[in-house]
Amino acid sequence: MAPLLKLNILLLIVLICFTFHANATHRCVRHGEYCNERIRLDCCFGDCVKNKCSDDF
């Protein structure tokens, strides 16, 4: 039972690390804010037009 518990803890740690790494490298910005796909600043909604987020609802 102990080896299975260690494996579960290891998998949980790996999952947490990947989750925080993904959030740290990718950011969502709102309407009118600066966006740039090269540095991973994407618009939450709409498209990045001339480095500004434009909402398309």
UniProtKB/Swiss-Prot annotation:
Disulfide-linked positions = C28-C44, C35-C48, C43-C53
Give Gene Ontology CC terms: extracellular region
Q: Which domain of life is it from?
A: Eukaryota
Keyword Signal set for record: yes
* A molecular-function term among this protein's GO annotations: toxin activity
Main subcellular localization, coarse class? secreted
Q: Which UniProt keywords are listed?
A: Disulfide bond, Knottin, Neurotoxin, Secreted, Signal, Toxin
Its subcellular locations are: Secreted
Organ and tissue specificity: Expressed by the venom gland. Exclusively expressed in the venom thoracic glands (and not in body tissues).
Cleavable signal peptide = 1-24
- What family is this? Belongs to the asilidin-1 family.
Functional note: May act as a neurotoxin.
What free text does the record give on domains? The presence of a 'disulfide through disulfide knot' structurally defines this protein as a knottin.
* Protein's name according to its UniProt entry: U-Asilidin(1)-Mar2a
Q: Which organism is it from?
A: Machimus arthriticus (Breck robberfly)
Question: Upper lineage ranks?
Answer: Eukaryota, Metazoa, Ecdysozoa, Arthropoda, Hexapoda
